Amino acid sequence: MPLNKESKQAVVAEVAAQVAKAQTVVLAEYRGIAVGDLTKLRAKAREQQVYLRVLKNTLARRAVEGTPFAPLAEQMTGPLIYGISEDAIAAAKVVNDFGKTNDKLIIKAGSYEGKVMDKAGVQALANIPSREELLSKLLYVMQAPVSGFARALAALAEKKQGEETAA
């Protein structure tokens, strides 16, 4: 069903609002993917706070005009699904992970910090650990010396207690 002018303007405004707050935009070709699989992809995207939408390319081009993602307009050809996220790696991770299990989803391009990336760039971005993963690793590294010191003190106290009991 064709969209009327007001509907198109509403779609462009909605997508432009998402793009304005985004750090990353990923484009992927979805030709031949079953509806059930696309539903799973959308559910995974929602979990990760990724705005995922199939758009007409002309509407997407209008939505990215005047933004750091404008250079992506050249890549907007064919049936594309757009992943947009405020998190730097979430969109790339969701699309890349789904692409590993479904070979019909083909990453075309992406943009991060105003730079256009090819498929390899999007995959490299997706392989970076998330902020939460990095923070948990940092916390572990910071806690390791403290917990080791605490265990050493406990062992020393236990040893002294054993000596006092034996004496």
Curated annotation (Swiss-Prot):
Family: Belongs to the universal ribosomal protein uL10 family.
GO molecular function (one): large ribosomal subunit rRNA binding
PANTHER family assigned: 39S RIBOSOMAL PROTEIN L10, MITOCHONDRIAL
Keywords: Ribonucleoprotein, Ribosomal protein, RNA-binding, rRNA-binding
Organism: Paraburkholderia xenovorans (strain LB400)
Quaternary data: Part of the ribosomal stalk of the 50S ribosomal subunit. The N-terminus interacts with L11 and the large rRNA to form the base of the stalk. The C-terminus forms an elongated spine to which L12 dimers bind in a sequential fashion forming a multimeric L10(L12)X complex.
Any single GO CC term annotated in Swiss-Prot or TrEMBL for this entry: ribosome
Domain of life: Bacteria
UniProt xrefs under InterPro entries: Ribosomal_uL10 (IPR001790), Ribosomal_uL10-like_sf (IPR043141), Ribosomal_uL10_bac (IPR022973), Ribosomal_uL10_bac_type (IPR047865)
Described function: Forms part of the ribosomal stalk, playing a central role in the interaction of the ribosome with GTP-bound translation factors.
GO biological process: translation
Record-given protein name: Large ribosomal subunit protein uL10
